[in-house]
Amino acid sequence: AARAVRRILVAGPVTGMVKFLARPKVEGIDRLSDLAKRTDVGGVIFAPNHHSHIDTPLMTTAVPSPWNDRLVVAAAADYFFDKRTKGTIAALALNAFPIDRETTSRKSSDELRALLARDWSVVIYPEGGRSPDGWGQDFKAGAAYLSIKTGSPVVPVFIDGTGSIFGKGMKRPRRGHVRVIFGAPLFPEENDNTRRFNERIEKAVTLLGDESLTDFWTSRQRAAAGRSTALTGPEYSGWRRQWSLYEHRKLGAAGQRRRQKRRWPNLG
């Protein structure tokens, strides 16, 4: 009964709210087509960057079939579950699972592993919390750890634009445009430990972020040349860091204009 109610809520109010506020454009679904056909893979770990509380309903609506019907979102316990009514709504509408932003308890980890073992998929924000300044944060190893322990693949995801809609410190949301880019699934390799696999996940999300700024081929060329923009931004702080973010967004605006101008050649 709860799943039936959740389907109605996601298809109706949740999707309506996301479309109204974010007008999302979802890309990269084709990169998951082979994974969807594999009968030896059950639960999947989706690992997006995190800029806004809007990210949680956004991911609930953006994750494609066959995973969206059995999807749990690891959500901040101190925000989504700070009040009983809010927690009930989050659990029912978003299938949100309360998790501590800073440290994942043994109990939470075991429960997530059990869900993955039962072919449920999980959304985990590796940064552990929302961006405080528009740049990303270093990834924590929760997604990598769960993947290594369960064998579940990690799908890197880059979300672009939610920080401008309802970023940290904003009192109320405002409308904007959002892109959600799914990357190719990552499996832990034989010699991977949690640290190395976590670095691969962060690198994959960084590449998707550069793809969002430019385009697929430009981002790969920049990565090969070692010129990808770091997800965490420059190491310095203060106005220089904010200025770099401004320049970073100018690059993204230029990339968007290039994509809009691109047309298929006339072969007639």
Predicted regions and their residues:
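Short hydrophobic helices that act as membrane-entry/anchoring signals
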Residues: R3-A22, A91
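Non-catalytic C-terminal accessory region of glycerolipid acyltransferases
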Residues: V5, R106-G268
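Helix-to-loop junction immediately C-terminal to a conserved catalytic motif
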Residues: T15-H50
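Short, basic, glycine/proline-bearing loop/turn elements
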Residues: M17, L92-I99, P126-G129
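Short, flexible loop segments at the rims of nucleotide/cofactor-binding pockets, characterized by
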Residues: M17-K25, H50, P98-E102, D133, ...
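Conserved beta-strand scaffold positions in the cores of enzyme catalytic domains, especially
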Residues: V26, V73, A96-P98, V154-P156, ...
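Well-ordered alpha-helical segments embedded in enzymatic catalytic cores
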Residues: G28, L58, K107-E111
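Catalytic core of membrane glycerolipid acyltransferases/transacylases, capturing the structured
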Residues: R38-E102
